[in-house]
From Swiss-Prot:
Record-annotated disulphide pairs: none
Molecular functions (GO terms): glycine transmembrane transporter activity
Reported function: Mitochondrial glycine transporter that imports glycine into the mitochondrial matrix. Plays an important role in providing glycine for the first enzymatic step in heme biosynthesis, the condensation of glycine with succinyl-CoA to produce 5-aminolevulinate (ALA) in the mitochondrial matrix.
Lineage, uppermost ranks: Eukaryota, Fungi, Dikarya, Ascomycota, Pezizomycotina
GO annotation, cellular component aspect: mitochondrial inner membrane
Membrane topology term: Multi-pass membrane protein
Protein name: Mitochondrial glycine transporter
């Protein structure tokens, strides 16, 4: 098995991340839109929001409102994130003591990506996500505004022009503080939980296959299943811990003049609505994050595995 970071080109990771991000964004846009609508007002409920959209004109189109900015944000955001994460993880693995021994011990594993310590997984995941989030923040602001029913934007150009005219360039980075505080811990915790879960499930699956007399090498379907289950579990834990920051971020991006910055928003939300408002949209976010993260990571790892396999075949023929 490859170490992933060494044999696969950074282009593989960029395009694998791009494809996995686009697919998950398109499939799960309705959940993202519902989360935004529920978080924008204390009076909104999930059922009421679904009923309101479904009874309105063009319900199917309305559920996928904002798909273009979501696809741009998630697609290119995932591409930047995965390629940055791979570069950081590969660099960290080169400097880790006992790397060769660690790789040998982890030979029967559902992933071909570099194996790092828990601290390194936490740090690289957090840094890569913050960097990708900063680059994609203008698209994120456009996405949230476009999904909300507080604004009557007819196009992304109209939304961009209005934000720039009323708020200036800083308007495109509204909520970045809350986003970074949410995304950095989430991404770090996700990579940490994801890698731990994969390691344990891979070890368990290998023992089961050895007991049954099958090959000790995990099959493609088994590896994909392990990666998907690990992604769901990691997303659920990370999402629950970081949801308050997501709720704060959404309020700032939708109503910057009312909520100002992260500290002001936190105080105002708590004083006016209590602790519960920080967990608005948690159920939708867990469901969406669990599926989107698991889908994106499983597809990403499978594309990388296939790219490496193809590369090895080509190199063997040369």
């Amino acid at each position: 098995m490859s170490d992933g970071g060494k044999s696969s080109s950074s282009y593989f990771h960029f395009f694998a991340g791009l494809n996995s991000g686009i697919l998950s964004a398109v499939l799960l846009q309705p959940a993202d839109l519902l989360k935004t609508r529920v978080q924008q007002s204390r009076s909104s409920t999930l059922f009421g929001t679904i009923q309101s959209i479904a009874s309105g004109p063009n319900p199917v189109r309305q559920f996928w409102r904002g798909t273009l900015p979501s696809t741009l944000r998630t697609g290119f955001g995932s591409a930047i994130y995965f390629s940055s994460l791979n570069a950081l993880r590969h660099r960290a693995s080169l400097g880790a003591a006992g790397r060769a021994d660690a790789a040998a011990k982890g030979a029967e594993h559902s992933s071909s990506l570099p194996k790092l310590s828990n601290t390194a997984n936490l740090a690289t995941g957090a840094f890569a996500r913050t960097w990708a989030g900063f680059i994609m923040m203008p698209i994120t602001v456009l996405k949230v505004r476009y999904e909300s029913n507080l604004y009557a934007y007819n196009s992304l150009f109209t939304a961009s022009r209005d934000i720039f005219r009323t708020e200036g360039l800083k308007g495109f980075f509204a909520g970045f503080g809350a986003t970074a505080v949410r995304d950095a811990p989430y991404a770090g915790l996700y990579v940490l939980f994801y890698e731990q879960s994969k390691r344990k499930l891979s070890s368990l699956a290998t023992k089961i296959e050895q007991t049954s007399g099958a090959s000790t090498k995990l099959s493609t379907s088994t590896s994909a299943g392990i990666n998907f289950v690990s992604g769901v579990a990691a997303a659920g834990l990370g999402t629950t811990i970081t949801n308050p920051f997501d709720a704060i971020k959404t309020r700032i991006q939708l109503m910057p003049e009312r909520y100002g910055n992260m500290v002001q928003a936190t105080k105002k939300m708590y004083m006016e609505e209590g602790l519960r408002c920080f967990f608005d949209g948690l159920g939708i976010r867990i469901a969406r994050k669990a599926v989107s993260s698991a889908l994106a990571w499983t597809l990403y790892e499978e594309l990388i595995r296939r790219a490496e396999t193809l590369k090895e075949v080509v190199e063997d023929k040369i």
